[in-house]
UniProtKB/Swiss-Prot annotation:
Species per Swiss-Prot/TrEMBL record: Mycosarcoma maydis
Compartments (UniProt record): Cell membrane
Top EC category: transferase
Membrane topology, record value: Peripheral membrane protein
Name of the featured protein: Acetyltransferase MATC1
Role description: Acetyltransferase; part of the gene cluster that mediates the biosynthesis of mannosylerythritol lipids (MELs), surface-active substances that enhance the availability of water-insoluble substrates. Mannosylerythritol lipid production is responsible for hemolytic activity of Ustilago maydis.
EC number: 2.3.1.-
Pathway: Secondary metabolite biosynthesis
Gene Ontology annotations for the cellular component aspect, listed alphabetically: plasma membrane
InterPro entries hit by this protein: CAT-like_dom_sf, Plant_Fungal_Acyltransferase
Active site (UniProt): H186 (proton acceptor), D459 (proton acceptor)
PANTHER family associated with the record: ACETYLTRANSFERASE MATC1 (PTHR31642:SF294), TRICHOTHECENE 3-O-ACETYLTRANSFERASE (PTHR31642)
Main location: membrane
Homology family: Belongs to the plant acyltransferase family.
């Protein structure tokens, strides 16, 4: 049961969490984002620069607590300078528990990265095929947790009660690589947020002062928060007020459809494809293959242009690299999964109000820092499972682009924000079930896109061991040390099935990750066509 009294902690300053950040889609997910560097980095340099960053941005050491009096019902309890100093001392103490540490260092320099994560190890050693697509499994769960997030929270219930930072870091050094991970609750924000933190870490690593965050506590979407339905005046007028329109491709379920959807999900999770049969896989597309897919898509659309009676001026047939990559992924997912061809497939992607503001937005609404999120679910127009497999790549990419174009209309973005705030606030969810398919009996999947965050540009050369351990004022600067792979994992009370991430560019190619059964990963009509790394 949620408390009616705001939590107060001595030595901490309370700052409300933004309303959109406090929706269930964010409170339910704890994420880890790892950059894999093909070098032996100095763990001490990474540690000292992380502490320097936290001192500049103390919100990274904040606790998260319930504060019913605030619009979101949640607040960051940010340590004062004196408290932060005490927390850092505790964190540095080797006798402290992992959950008490802002950053954990793990020296595995006696091991090769190949023992831990074979497909990414091939990127570390520049051994991935440059002309063909590769696929491989994630590390064993227990090994991964020890390697990247041993000090991270594992559930929302734990996070809002424990004396623990909601953002933590871990650096693990192997003989041939170093992993650097940021673990966080999704209330912190989105991929742009984590890129911003890595950039701040890079700045501190370079020995430069990290600028203080501006506008901490400014809520970018507070003006879209619907009136409090507990307000007596609002209740009195409620019947005369029109219900807000739902955004495109979202549907409100009544009791019958709600029961049907829940029963189908239980059958899927417990009987048809139990969670224990799913594994996480990573897929690498070399740049040569990306270029090939783009050429194929352009050829498909040129054929459509020449065969269509519709004038090219009436329909824009251009597609982006993201459109094509997403189309390729969806073709393979549907070809690899046992779905009845005639079954409707409902696909959701992520759009971001940071770059596509809602109607009514003015620039001054947004804080001057990046530690907040703007991610929103955007369903594509429905297709059958067969269409996802058989449509030419270019036409499927066009379908994706046209669906997203509708979704990013400012008025539709406004509706998406309002829907999230009206129905899925952690403080008080509406209890209504909204779903991105009109029919409960549908195949569904989703994909988030981190490519635009450009994690591959992070440069940790200042921590390169030879350079760091033998710094001379006249020494030439070390060559750039950029990640060759991006990996991720998450903790959620919901199923991880059918969730994918376009992780972005690294090692002159594109990385994806998602959940598959072993049979799906080896299906010769889909992912089984590619090089399997084990």
């Amino acid at each position: 049961m949620k408390s009616n009294v705001d939590t107060v902690l001595d030595g901490y300053t309370s700052v409300p969490v933004g309303v959109l950040d406090s929706t269930l889609a964010n409170t339910d997910i704890l994420t880890r984002i790892t950059l894999v560097f093909p070098s032996s980095l100095s763990l001490s340099a990474l540690q000292e620069s992380w502490y320097a960053l936290v001192r500049s941005w103390p919100i990274l050491a904040a606790r998260v607590r319930a504060t019913p009096s605030t619009p979101s019902g949640l607040s960051y309890l940010i340590p004062t300078p004196a408290t932060l100093e005490s927390l850092e001392t505790r964190s540095r103490n080797s006798a402290s528990k992992p959950l008490e540490k802002h950053i954990v260092l793990l020296d595995q320099s006696s091991r090769s990265f190949s023992d831990y994560h074979p497909i990414v190890a091939k990127a570390v050693h520049s051994n991935l095929d440059r002309n063909n697509i590769s696929i491989g499994g994630a590390p064993l769960v227990e090994h991964e947790k020890a390697t990247i997030c041993s000090n991270a929270c594992t559930s929302w219930k734990q996070l809002i009660k424990q004396d623990q930072a909601f953002v933590t870091a871990q650096a693990t050094k192997f003989a041939d690589a170093t992993t650097v991970t940021i673990s966080f609750s999704h209330i912190l924000g989105d991929a742009f947020t984590i890129k911003h933190i890595f950039q701040g870490w890079q700045t501190a690593l370079n020995g430069q002062a990290v600028q203080e965050l501006q506008d901490v506590g400014k809520d970018p979407f507070i003006k879209y928060l619907p009136k409090d339905t507990n307000d007596k005046k609002h209740k009195k007028n409620k019947k005369s007020e029109p219900a807000p329109d739902l955004p495109l491709q979202w549907f409100r379920y009544g009791l019958a459809r709600k029961i049907k959807l829940i029963s189908l999900l239980l059958w899927e999770v417990k009987v048809k494809k139990p969670e224990k049969t799913l594994g996480q896989y990573y897929i690498y597309l070399p740049q040569a293959k990306v270029d090939e897919l783009m050429a194929q898509a352009r050829s498909d659309l040129e054929q459509l242009r020449s065969s269509s009676a519709t004038s090219a001026t009436e329909r824009d047939l251009n597609v982006s690299t993201f459109n094509v990559l997403f189309a390729w992924l969806l073709q393979n997912i549907h070809a690899s999964t046992a779905i009845k061809p005639s079954k409707t497939s409902s696909v959701i992607c992520i759009i971001n109000a940071k770059t596509r503001p809602p109607a009514g937005h003015v620039p001054a609404d947004y804080p001057r820092h990046q530690l907040w999120g703007g991610a929103l679910g955007a369903p594509l127009r429905p297709l059958s499972a067969a269409e996802y497999v058989t449509l030419p790549l270019g036409q499927l990419a066009l379908h994706i682009r046209e669906s997203i174009t509708e979704q990013v209309d400012p008025e539709n973005i406004r509706k998406s924000v309002v829907m999230a705030l009206k129905h899925s606030m952690w403080k008080k969810p509406s209890g209504e079930l909204l779903f991105f398919s009109q029919n409960p009996n549908t195949y569904w999947c989703g994909c988030t896109e981190w490519r635009s965050a450009k994690f591959h540009t992070i440069d940790f050369s200042a921590a390169a061991t030879p350079h760091h351990d033998a710094i001379q004022p006249t020494a030439a600067p070390a060559a750039s040390v950029n990640p060759v792979a991006i990996t991720t994992n998450m903790e959620t009370p919901m199923t991880k099935r059918n969730r994918w991430a376009l992780l972005g560019e690294a090692n002159n190619g594109i990385w994806f990750t998602g959940g598959l059964t072993a049979n799906e990963a080896s299906n010769k009509n889909g992912f089984g066509r590619y090089i399997f790394v084990e």
